[in-house]
Amino acid sequence: MKNIKLISWNVNGIRAIAKKGFHDWINKENPDILCLQETKAWKEQLDDSLINIDEYTSYFSEASRKGYSGTAIYTKEKPIEIKYGIGKEEFDSEGRFVIAKYPEFILFNIYFPNGKAREERLKYKMNFYEAFQNYVVDLKNKGKNIIICGDVNTAHKEIDLARPKPNSKVSGFLPLEREWIDRFLAAGFIDTLRMFNNKPEIYTWWDMISRARERNVGWRIDYFFISESLRKNITNAYTLPNVMGSDHCPIGIEIKI
């Protein structure tokens, strides 16, 4: 068996984070697999230092619109297969997926849509949730071990945000969004952090304009989910709230497989 350390981080712009100690942080943290969301760049816009990092192979999923969305994986072990979507153009065109198949599991790195902008984006978000769930449940039902990480853009329970009552009618904490997470977990997936820590005030995103991070007025909207089949393999799940550079902090899991 080997120990694998996975980290996920919405970096809110990979070129911006590169100027804020990103390479030093990777060297120090030394994940086996690093998943990034909201990279906001096409690969052709990146310096070689961001494409080729030491012992990692990198894979980038780009939105058709420049400077928007985007996901990336840096991995020490080369995957058997990489996909950049679930076969639905309306979702795949926004660069929201990097799906890496390894011998022991399939890893989904996803930047889920934000539904705050307008009603049609909320509808898009909910349709995205359902399409993704159908896709991943089908794989799980075929006996695949699944790891899912990324910015889900929804806080699941009241414990997952500092101010639940004032936000009960805000996208990101709407009943229909929260109910989707209920359904998703009921379909055979686990919120890994809550296996190890049921304390309040554990957040992964803070509003930058109001300097909410200084007061820890945040939301937990970034997750590592696993299929039930991997429950016994997870040895740790955590957040890294002291890592700066984005409006999100990184999250991690360790798995023995």
What are these regions (language model features)?
Residues 66-81, 211-232:
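Conserved beta strand-loop-helix elements of the APE1-like EEP
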Residues 76, 100-103, 227-228, 253-257:
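Active-site beta-strand termini and strand-to-loop segments that position acidic
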Residues 10, 26-44, 107, 136-158, ...:
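Active-site beta-strand/loop signature of hydrolases that rely on acidic residues for catalysis
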Residues 3-12, 104-116, 149:
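Active-site-proximal beta-strand elements of phosphoester/diester hydrolases
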